[in-house]
């Protein structure tokens, strides 16, 4: 019913705009409709400018710790439990810190997990900031654990600031942004063990990871 309803309304549209190659293919395959692909706008100069603003944030001041960041709404879609389970495995093997920034109904669930697992010294949960970029700029790795997305702008913003990205291979967006793993690492949705392995291997593969970061940055066309 939904498919027929969509087709009915689509025929009255002069032009249909989508924001990812995946959706362009879906419209072609499901509805036999040609669409126009226009990526979400990305103001690189503003991101870079804001990232350089002074930030007094001692949590990320330890130069010996691997610094990981996640910026996302606190909802089931963003699957923070996978992130926390993966991080719990890392703490036992590596000196690291995790900053989780966002807002939403699952905030207490996230904080309770951290308390129960005694991870308070390693994880900081803060509300979304007007300027998230100077926090992001202090991190080594950006992690996305979503169950599904559209085209997550936050991955593009992390690429602008030359951060290594580890993302769930969720529908849709991460695989397209990371070029099937050429510009970052992908793991299956919910696979916290593989996520932890990829984070642990980060320092061992620095040369390869820096190459991926530079490839991503040099191919940003938005």
What are these regions (language model features)?
Residues 1-222:
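Membrane-interface segments of envelope glycosyltransferases acting on lipid-linked substrates or membrane lipids
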């Amino acid at each position: 019913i939904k498919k027929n309803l969509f087709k009915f309304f689509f025929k009255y549209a002069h032009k249909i705009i989508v924001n990812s190659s995946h959706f362009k293919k879906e419209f072609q395959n499901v509805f036999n409709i040609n669409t126009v692909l226009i990526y979400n706008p990305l103001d690189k100069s503003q991101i870079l400018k804001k990232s350089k603003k002074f930030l007094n944030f001692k949590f990320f001041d330890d130069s010996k710790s691997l610094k990981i960041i996640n910026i996302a709404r606190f909802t089931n879609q963003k699957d923070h439990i996978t992130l926390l389970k993966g991080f719990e495995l890392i703490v036992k093997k590596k000196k690291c810190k995790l900053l989780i920034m966002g807002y939403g109904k699952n905030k207490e669930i996230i904080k309770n997990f951290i308390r129960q697992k005694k991870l308070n010294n390693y994880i900081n949960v803060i509300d979304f900031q007007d300027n998230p970029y100077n926090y992001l700029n202090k991190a080594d790795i950006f992690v996305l654990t979503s169950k599904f997305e559209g085209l997550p702008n936050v991955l593009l913003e992390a690429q602008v600031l030359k951060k290594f990205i580890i993302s769930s291979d969720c529908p849709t967006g991460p695989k397209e942004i990371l070029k099937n793993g050429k510009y970052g690492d992908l793991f299956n949705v919910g696979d916290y063990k593989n996520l932890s392995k990829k984070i642990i291997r980060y320092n061992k593969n620095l040369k390869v990871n820096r190459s991926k970061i530079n490839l991503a940055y040099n191919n940003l066309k938005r």
